[in-house]
Amino acid sequence: RTRSFGDALKSDNNIRIIAEIKKASPSLGIIREDFNPVEIARIYEASGAAAISVLTDEKFFQGCLSYLTDVKKSVNLPILRKDFIVDAYQIYEARSAGADAILLIAALLSKEEIQRYLELAGELDMDCLVEVHSETELKKVLQTNAHIIGINNRDLATFKTDMETTLQLRPMIPAGKIVVSESGIKTRADVEKLMKEGIDAILVGETLMKSNNISTKLHELLGLINHKDTKSTK
């Protein structure tokens, strides 16, 4: 049985955090030298993350599927496979590796493919986080059964992040969908701005991976400690 990714992101009061495990990125290169996925996952779980995203792309992010399998065995949170999924095979592969959810990137897929992959994932008891970066992509996704919509603040052409992307696209998403803001979220002030706009969850990777104290940073983002006390963790 899978763990429900969608249910983990529902909350009445505080935002839910999908904490991401990634060793490297195209824009930054190696982000974290002392990279132990299982250890990081355990810190995430103990520090209040609602779900964990694991980068499994090898070429750009130095990830691998075995990271996901190892993480799944070591925590009780739902696990998202973060990768460039362009083929049904990768969806079966994700399920067999232990994923509870997969990322579908609207920019890479046609409306028909998104719908087909949503249905396949559903048959395999997995949720999908369907990611958009523009109004055109969002309109395409809203013509499918996507239930969890991620707004990526990072422009994949320039790698720059801008939270305005979330603020612009959020009002176009109908009630009843779970909305996730991804990338470029660094402080509790950022989180509070997103909560005001009705964002259910955020996906945070680099901010946590670059932190000297992952647990403190996660607590700060969740508003569990006063961010003025955390200058040393920057």
Regions found by a protein language model. Give the residues of each.
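N-terminal amphipathic alpha-helix/helix-capping segment at the start of soluble metabolic enzymes
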Residues: 1-22, 26-27
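Glycine-rich phosphate-binding active-site loops on the catalytic face of alpha/beta enzymes
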Residues: 93-113, 150-159, 199-218
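Catalytic cores of alpha/beta
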Residues: 86-97, 134-144, 181, 185-204
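N-terminal active-site wall of soluble small-molecule enzyme domains
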Residues: 16, 28-129, 135-140, 166-169
